[in-house]
Structure formats: structure tokens, C-alpha cells
Design a protein with these regions (language model features):
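Short, basic amphipathic alpha-helical segments that act as recognition/interaction helices
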Residues: 19-21, 25-56
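Charged, low-complexity intrinsically disordered terminal regions and linker tails
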Residues: 53-177
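Residue-level marker of intrinsically disordered, low-complexity segments enriched
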Residues: 6-7, 48, 102, 114
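Short Lys/Arg-rich basic patches
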Residues: 1-19, 23-31
Length: 177
């Protein structure tokens, strides 16, 4: 029978005393270790504050919980989630993901009628957040070419000053493969 769980496996090495503490706490509460871990991770990320990657409505929103921002961009569509994260910049998503998103958002080839951020999963209404940019893309095309764009961005980073255009890169790639 197929495993229908949408959960993913997380593997990490931790100090032996933390593992023992986790096991003892789970036993004492009659809970599964995985549930306690999920709660600890979510609470830990909730406690981390970041510079708000959106336009804040109020001055007190200049710093927000990481999970508030993450929840605003989350999608089970991995490409959309990564595009949203990268569109918020390198401080939020790291350099490579930001470069991929910047390339896609700035290339007419990927333009379309899909609003990348939409209502930010309700955060526009709840918090008054607005993204700094409102990219509109052809999402099926972005989904199809996302891995190629990731390769292209890595290629450009590793082969400076050589900078072929995206179409030239795709042609080089198809001839090599």
C-alpha cells in the first residue's frame, strides 16, 4: 500500500542529550517524537525575526516573524513557492534563488497573466503587506523551464566573464546533451 503522507523526511545529527531530552519529553507527554519536533521547529522559526520583506503597513511591522513571511509566500507548488521567495530578494531567499527569480521576473519571455504573489495567502488583508514588485508570469512556462534557468544562473556565476544569452545557453545545452 502506498504511503499517502505528504510529510518529508528530515535527517539531522543532534547532541545525545537533546535526543534523550526529546525522547523523555515525548514519553512523559505520551506524544510522538515527530509531533514534538514539528512543534519545536515551528515555534523556533516563529521566534526568529527578520526585516519585513514586504512593504509594511505600520512602522511596527518593519521586523516580523520569519514564519509570518514564510506563510505569506508558501505554496505546495514548489516552483511558485521558490519564485515568490526569490522575488523577495537575497536577504530572504539566498543569492542563487534571488538571481533565478530576478531573471524570470525581468525576462519578457516569461511574462504572462499569473500574479506571482496574489493576496499573499491572506496577508494582504490580515497584515496589509504588499510585495515591493508585482511580477506577472506565464506560470506553466516558468514551471517547465525552472530547472534550466537554475542551471543557467549557476553557469553564469561559474563562468564569468562569459555571459551567453538565455536562448544561446539553451542551444549550447541542447547541442551538448
Amino acid at each position: 500500500m502506498a504511503n499517502r503522507s505528504k510529510k518529508v523526511v528530515l535527517s539531522a545529527r543532534v547532541e545525545p542529550y537533546l535526543k534523550a531530552a526529546l525522547e523523555l519529553f515525548a514519553t512523559s507527554r505520551n506524544e510522538k517524537i515527530v509531533k514534538i519536533l514539528e512543534t519545536c521547529v515551528e515555534n523556533g522559526l516563529n521566534d526568529r525575526t527578520i526585516t519585513n520583506p514586504f512593504k509594511p503597513r505600520h512602522k511596527d511591522q518593519e521586523k516580523i516573524s520569519f514564519m509570518v513571511a514564510f506563510t505569506a509566500i508558501w505554496s505546495e507548488n514548489e516552483t511558485l513557492y521558490k519564485l515568490r521567495a526569490g522575488s523577495l530578494g537575497s536577504d530572504f531567499a539566498g543569492e542563487e534563488l534571488a538571481m533565478v527569480a530576478m531573471f524570470i521576473n525581468g525576462k519578457k519571455y516569461f511574462a504572462g497573466d499569473f500574479d506571482v504573489f496574489g493576496d499573499l495567502n491572506g496577508s494582504v488583508e490580515t497584515f496589509g503587506f504588499k510585495p515591493h514588485m508585482q511580477p506577472m508570469v506565464n506560470l506553466p512556462l516558468v514551471e517547465e523551464e525552472w530547472p534550466i534557468v537554475e542551471e543557467y544562473v549557476r553557469f553564469l556565476a561559474n563562468n564569468k566573464p562569459f555571459e551567453p544569452g538565455y536562448e544561446d545557453y539553451k542551444r549550447m545545452r541542447s547541442k551538448a546533451g
